[in-house]
């Protein structure tokens, strides 16, 4: 796949709307592109993922390039101006996904077969939702029983073409309601809103204590208040509907923490809490001393010997949090683009950077297969 074809690939993919749970058109289109680019097998799987494979499915080694094909909402007119591709998903994360598709195509079926390597490229669905449906399906498929477990994995997320991401913090979401019988505001009892504020203050104090002596944000417990709505119901109760969220550091005991939260909530005598935890993802941090990282070092040097590979730890989550704890293989995230543009109305990707990243993926696969 040459530069012009690779650019048409990413532009075409970005031009197809694919909100979470609405990815079918983009998945079908990408499968056709992979078939045309020489993939041995390309199909939409049961989860809705776009999947392309190079080499023998029963090869001695498997590497999974796991991108995601869904985006957050936002209508940004798709265009290329002054080397910049504008459009929703150009950075997060159709640019990285197209990088995988094009880079693996350049590596090619013949090279994969000669090296005894099975290359699997995935455009996963629902990464932007808390479900990560596509990644969970792939994690179960390549579990060592249904299909050989991968020897390495690359997650498709923007980190610039000359950097790789080694880890992501975990996540926990708490949706809850708190209600209590109505009372006069001049009375002695605290309002339900005040009670929830006290609950939130406990959360922030707990985080402050947990973070003592930890200077790096990646190592800290980071709570956020995402929703706080007061109302009254037909039972003459005052109600708060709220959501708390946490970014979790490596080694954090989420089960114990949820037990603590339940205990604190049950301690407010007049207030009934209904807590619903969801969206838990385990934090994950990979090693930088392994064959996959060395392959990236070799790939980057081949593309541009003057560049040095950078290493990043991120405070959000990605599908690395889903598959890392299952596969326990060397894993990094890679992709062109500035992640500060994720989800913004000005989202855009440098075409030149994208092409460099395509070549880095090709050369990394060559180094990995050696």
Stretch-by-stretch model annotation:
Residues 159, 172-370:
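Metal-dependent amide/peptide-bond hydrolase catalytic core
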Residues 98-171, 369-370:
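Acidic/histidine-rich catalytic neighborhood of metal-dependent amide-processing enzymes
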Residues 1-90, 108-116, 328:
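Acidic/His- and Gly-rich active-site-bordering loop/insert found
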Residues 30, 97-107, 135-138, 196-199, ...:
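Buried hydrophobic packing segments
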Residues 85-98, 105, 190-193, 348-355:
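Short, conserved micro-motifs enriched in small and acidic residues
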Residues 7, 24-28, 97, 258-262, ...:
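Short, surface-exposed alpha-helical segments at coil->helix boundaries
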Residues 66-81, 150-151, 167-177, 332:
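Acidic-glycine-rich active-site phosphate/pyrophosphate-binding loop
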């Amino acid at each position: 796949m040459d530069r012009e074809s690779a650019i048409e690939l990413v532009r075409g993919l970005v031009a197809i709307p694919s909100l979470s749970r609405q990815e079918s058109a983009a998945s079908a289109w990408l499968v056709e592109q992979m078939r045309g680019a020489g993939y041995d097998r390309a199909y939409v799987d049961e989860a809705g993922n776009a999947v392309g494979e190079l080499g023998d499915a029963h090869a001695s080694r498997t590497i999974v390039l796991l991108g995601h094909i869904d985006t957050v909402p936002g209508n940004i007119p798709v265009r290329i101006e002054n080397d910049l591709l504008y459009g929703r998903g150009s950075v997060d994360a159709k640019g990285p996904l197209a990088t995988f598709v094009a880079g693996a195509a350049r590596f090619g079926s013949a090279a994969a077969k000669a090296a005894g390597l099975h290359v699997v490229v995935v455009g996963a669905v629902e990464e932007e939702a808390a479900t990560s449906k596509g990644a969970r399906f792939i994690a179960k498929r390549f579990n060592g029983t249904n299909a050989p477990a991968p020897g390495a994995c690359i997650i498709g997320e923007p980190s610039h073409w000359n950097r790789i991401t080694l880890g992501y913090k975990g996540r926990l979401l708490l949706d809850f309601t708190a209600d209590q019988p109505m009372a006069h505001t001049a009375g002695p009892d605290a309002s339900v809103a005040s009670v929830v504020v006290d609950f939130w203050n406990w959360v922030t104090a707990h985080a402050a204590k947990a973070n003592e002596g930890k200077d790096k944000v990646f190592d800290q417990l980071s709570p956020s208040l995402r929703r706080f709505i007061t109302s009254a119901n037909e039972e003459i109760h005052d109600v708060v509907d709220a959501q708390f969220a946490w970014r979790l550091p490596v080694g954090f005991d989420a089960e114990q923490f949820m037990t603590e939260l339940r205990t604190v909530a049950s301690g407010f005598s007049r207030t009934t809490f209904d807590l619903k935890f969801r969206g838990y993802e385990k934090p994950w941090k990979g090693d930088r001393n392994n064959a996959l990282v060395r392959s990236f070092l070799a790939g980057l040097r081949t593309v541009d010997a003057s560049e040095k590979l950078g290493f990043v730890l991120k405070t959000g989550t990605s599908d690395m949090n889903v598959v890392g704890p299952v596969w326990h293989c060397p894993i990094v995230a890679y992709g062109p683009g500035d992640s500060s543009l994720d989800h913004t109305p000005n989202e855009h990707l440098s075409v030149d950077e994208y092409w460099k990243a395509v070549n880095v993926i090709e050369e990394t696969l060559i180094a990995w297969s050696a």
